[in-house]
Regions:
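Hydrophobic, aromatic-enriched alpha-helical segments typical of multi-pass transmembrane helices
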Residues: 2-177
Length: 177
């Protein structure tokens, strides 16, 4: 009788990156649901949805980095650290740091990290350009929504466009790994 041994895959190998791709797809689908603002009337359910999205985003960002780590160098690594750390701020408790909420500190850190990762990916053609455009457009929509509230009410165009980017990222990670 022979025993089959389990294959152990370390992070950065193909199955793990594909696994992270599924989390990117889940984050994208849940983000679109959040963007449609159908559950905003139930604050507990809305909070649970955003926690699930943020946790999925952590895996999605990790998978994205592992997918392109050999192509983007130290600048790409810095972008990953910023995006991952900023998402941790957003997903974590709403503590105040230097008078600011963790969420308000996390958003610009995530944005800077994702823009850096996108710029590196674009230069090295590591991810399809339309995905990177979705991230850039979502940042522009987020900034404009401070001045044009109709971009956020009754639906969040930022969430929808941002989430479409993660759907595409997830599809790419799954397809290529």
């Amino acid at each position: 009788m022979s025993m089959k041994t389990a294959t152990i895959h370390r992070p950065g190998t193909l199955p793990f990156v594909r696994f992270c791709g599924y989390f990117a797809v889940i984050a994208g689908l849940l983000g679109i649901l959040a963007g449609l603002r159908l559950i905003d009337k139930n604050p507990n359910l809305a909070e649970l949805l955003y926690v699930a999205i943020d946790l999925c985003l952590l895996f999605a960002i990790l998978g994205w980095h592992l997918h392109q780590q050999n192509k983007v160098g130290s600048v790409g690594l810095a972008g990953f650290f910023l995006a991952f750390t900023g998402t941790g701020f957003i997903a974590g408790p709403s503590a105040k740091i230097f008078g600011f909420t963790a969420y308000s500190l996390g958003i610009p850190v995530v944005a800077l990290g994702l823009l850096t990762m996108s710029w590196c990916a674009l230069r090295r053609r590591a991810i399809p350009g339309w995905i990177l455009s979705a991230f850039g457009l979502s940042l522009a929509i987020m900034i404009l929504s401070f001045y044009l509230p109709w971009l956020y009410q009754p639906i969040s165009f930022f969430n929808i466009v941002f989430s479409i980017g993660f759907l595409g990222l997830g599809y790419t990670l799954i397809k290529e790994h």
